[in-house]
Amino acid sequence: MAIKPILFNTPMVRAVRSDIKTETRRLINPRYRDDEYSFQIITNAHTGEFVRVEMIDEWENCTRFLPPQYLPGDILWVRESWAVAADLPGISDGGFVYRSDYTDYELSQLKEKHFCWKPSIHLPKSAARTFIKVTGVWAERLQDITDEQCIREGIQKWSKDGKLYKYAPADGEGDYPMWPWQDTPIAPRGAFVKLWDSTVPKSKLPQCGFAANPWVWAYRFEQCGNPFTEKEVEE
């Protein structure tokens, strides 16, 4: 078992902490070619099994193994956008505060006061409060995702009248979809496509967007307790 960090944006931190999001997909190293002959899945996926993707390099005529960053049993501490509590207007207490705990309205109020949150990548280990345990790992093309798996990615079902249903992550208040109703997809897959592409820089959409159908590692996980001892946190 390894203990490693993992990044999530603010909406997904909320979904993880609410046990709504239990899967995440991460690009397999995009610097390698990924045509039909260069990537091959060579092991079946199930909890506890090492899963890898084989790449055949036609120029060097050799095989390279690209292991996933996380394996079943690993515990991941979530890096999220944060701040020192004393930096917030009107707060003098010590400790840390987290952007995902604030509603969209509260965040807009803080923005008007020119308050800046610290990037999640800079969250110190001692400030971590959310921990997840990897229970499954497998490799697949991004477009292989099912509707059920889209729901596991943090997509929720919404309706205004109990007749028409649409799908999206929750907004900052947790009571409405993230997107305007007219822009909210009517299927889980459409919502996942919209969510995925929103995280990809426009310049990389041709290679990494949903339409490009890149290879990804899919990780299934569940929340768990803090694995750190006091000594490990200090390190």
Give the residues covered by each predicted segment.
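Secondary-structure transition motif
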Residues: 1-235
